[in-house]
Swiss-Prot record:
Protein name (record): Asparagine--tRNA ligase
GO cellular component, as recorded: cytoplasm
Gene Ontology biological-process entries: asparaginyl-tRNA aminoacylation
Taxonomic placement: Archaea, Methanobacteriati, Methanobacteriota, Thermococci, Thermococcales
Catalytic activity: tRNA(Asn) + L-asparagine + ATP = L-asparaginyl-tRNA(Asn) + AMP + diphosphate + H(+)
Annotated family: Belongs to the class-II aminoacyl-tRNA synthetase family.
Gene behind this protein: asnS
């Protein structure tokens, strides 16, 4: 391993010290007999100065031709200079070129490129400081979730990705051949988490989920990261409390640790700071009334899509819940409302500022006969869910759970214009490369 000093550690206090930097050329500018070479590594960008009378003619000419993303190692002396970014720069004495790049396919300002070009060259685009910032924020949100879940006594489990049945509807399954059988890519770990609660009571997982939806909206991916929780002995109101406490902690902790990165995308942090529980709660009935009062053409019983949710979120300055959805627009495993058989005990958490649903949750149907009936109503075969139905035959208990779309949360926190920027290599109906 090359011993090096990271860019973030080059500070005025190191004035006069010799350092070695290893990284990539971010920008190259010649001014007379000096070259200002900005070098990027995983921690930031530092200005280096290459003077012809120090490094000699040959090295100077080599440096002059270095294009963006050329990989280099430089050695030199730190000089405190208030004009330099960060108050210090490195005056180069030695330059080693690992690989020279003449022309990088992505413009210096990626925002000048089309989304399609950035996605075609996503393997190169992810080097940019903004993409790195997105990934750091995503990483920190997940780290914060782990902290909270560990503190609150939840157990992480590791469910399968290859499954035999649908959780969210058969039309969105990715089908594949599994030796002499048929298998599918998991839409959700939920059914397996439900099995785990009978031993561990409070469980969670973080896995990729797959949906063969041809939706081309700004909030849909065919592959996304799914943070899912399931707990025995909890009803809908209990699990909603878990959701708001978890999301609040994730956002506040990430604000604490990644404020600089978040400010690259948001000028105003007020909305993110305003995530202390409890979150507002409105019924589906109230949501329909609000939308109708805003001129939206929607009737009771209709599902709310991205457009309707966007209008609804304008009424709130923080995440909020919509609960009590009609049974026919929700999944088979959700428990029927005992006070209104038209509805299920389900709630979605919506993010403000037009982002909409980030969590879907419900109390689960714990009665064997009712669950069989719901499976049949959805046109599915109970035999395909025999193992899942066993959970209702051997010590069934009230339980609830939810799933959080990680990329949707990242998109809201960073105010991204499309969910595809919240994942390393996005998968959509139109894109599986690179």
């Amino acid at each position: 391993m090359i011993e090096k000093t990271y860019c973030q550690d080059i500070k005025p206090e190191l004035d006069g010290k010799r350092v070695k930097l290893a990284g990539w050329v971010y920008s190259n500018m010649r001014v007379g007999k000096k070259i200002f070479l900005w070098i990027r590594d995983s921690t930031g960008i530092i200005q280096t100065v290459i003077a012809k009378n120090v490094v000699g003619e040959d090295v100077f000419e080599t440096a002059k031709k270095l294009g963006r993303e050329s990989s280099v190692i430089v050695e030199g002396i730190v000089k405190a200079d208030e004009r330099a970014p960060g108050g210090a720069e490195v005056h180069v004495e030695k330059l080693k070129v690992i690989q020279a790049v003449s022309e990088f396919p992505i413009p210096e300002n990626p925002e000048q490129a089309s989304p399609e070009l950035l996605l075609d060259y996503r393997h190169l685009h992810i080097r940019s400081p903004k993409v790195s910032a997105i990934m750091r924020v995503k990483e920190t949100l997940i780290m914060a979730a782990r902290e909270w879940l560990l503190r609150e006594g939840w157990h992480e489990v590791f469910p399968p990705i290859l499954v035999t049945g649908a959780v969210e509807g058969g039309a969105t399954l990715f089908k594949l051949k599994y030796f002499d059988k048929v298998a599918y890519l998991s839409q959700s770990a939920q059914l397996y988490l439900e099995a785990a609660i009978f031993g561990l009571e409070k469980v969670w997982s973080l896995t990729p989920s797959f949906r063969a939806e041809k939706s081309r909206t700004r909030r849909h991916l065919t592959e996304f990261w799914h943070l899912e929780l399931e707990a025995a002995w909890m009803d809908l109101w209990d699990i909603m409390k878990v959701e708001e406490e978890l999301v609040s902690y994730m956002v506040q902790r990430t604000l604490e640790l990644r404020k600089k990165e978040i400010e690259m995308f948001r000028d105003d942090l007020t909305t993110l700071k305003n995530t202390e529980p409890p979150f507002p709660r409105i019924s589906y009935d109230e949501a329909i009334e609000i939308l109708q009062s805003k001129g939206v053409k929607i009737e009771w019983g209709d599902d709310m899509g991205a457009d309707e949710e966007r209008v609804l979120t304008q009424e709130f300055d923080r995440p909020f819940f919509v609960y009590g959805y009609p049974k026919h627009i929700k999944a088979f495993y959700m428990k029927e409302d005992p006070n209104d058989p038209r509805k299920v005990l389900a709630a979605d958490m919506l993010a403000p500022e037009g982002y909409g649903e980030i969590i879907g949750g419900s109390e689960r149907e714990d009665n064997y006969d009712k669950l069989v009936q719901r499976i049949k109503e959805e046109g599915m075969d109970p035999k395909d869910y025999e193992w899942y139905l066993d959970l209702r035959k051997y010590g069934s208990v009230p339980h609830s759970g939810f799933g959080l779309g990680v990329e949707r949360l990242v998109a809201w926190v960073l105010k991204l214009d499309h969910i595809r920027w919240a994942t390393l290599f996005p998968r959509t109906p139109a894109r599986i490369y690179p």
